[in-house]
Amino acid sequence: MSLCDVHCHTERSACAEDVTLEWYVDIARNTDAVFTITDHSAQLYYPPDNRWAFWGDNPREVFDSCRDEGPARIASYIEDVRAVQTGGMLLGIELDIFIDGTVVCDEDRLGDFDLFLGVAHTFPALRAEADVEEVYDQFQTMVGHLAKLNIDALAHPFRPMRGKGYEISDDLIKWLVDIAGEYDFALEINSHSICRDEDIRMAKLAWEMGVELAVGTDSHRKAEFGDFSYHRE
């Protein structure tokens, strides 16, 4: 069974290592692989010399300072990928938002993507390492905003919280599967940074409730691309 990878990075993401758009184009031309280019919207929107600003101390100030240049950079990204798009390569984006729902992208261009992932990479309670109840509450707020944007899938739902040491409750997983079903978006099983227990619980419940799962390698390195061993397991 062939799988569609919904989550692949290029050099336009600051976290990428050896993957490039040119490399993916070569794969698309010479294989039957189906995959989606999904670079971080914040790292496309923010200045090239400050691509980690969204995760920094003053993300809103930097965002406000590039409201003209940011949309232009998003437009350039779309044009660059579309110009070389071929075979089974799709154009997507990994969409960052603020806790108030502000999209870190040109919202008018969201319809220009073949697929877009929503993501709750960071939010105030998580950065402050607040009590778990506050973290859960803000995570639910973030996902609620993303759901209303008609995302196709939610990327690595639990990685940011697990990375800070928070346990993920069955109730939170149930809430997430419920809202995914209500708003008809998929939940990603992500193999770049594995949350095995949470993925198993989420996948079992999604299967029972008829909620779609998405397959993402979240490729930052060439060695990760096309490796679906975790998903098949």
What are the residue ranges of the model-derived segments?
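Charged catalytic cores and adjacent phosphate/nucleic-acid-binding surfaces used
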Residues: M1-V6, T10, E17, L21-E22, ...
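Generic macromolecular interface patches on structured domains
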Residues: A16, T38, M89-L90
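Short coil/turn segments at beta-strand junctions that form active-site/ligand-binding loops
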Residues: A33, G87, V211
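Hydrophobic residues within beta-strands of alpha/beta enzymes
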Residues: F35-I37, F116, L154, L187, ...
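Extended substrate/RNA-proximal surfaces in nucleic-acid metabolism proteins
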Residues: L44-E182
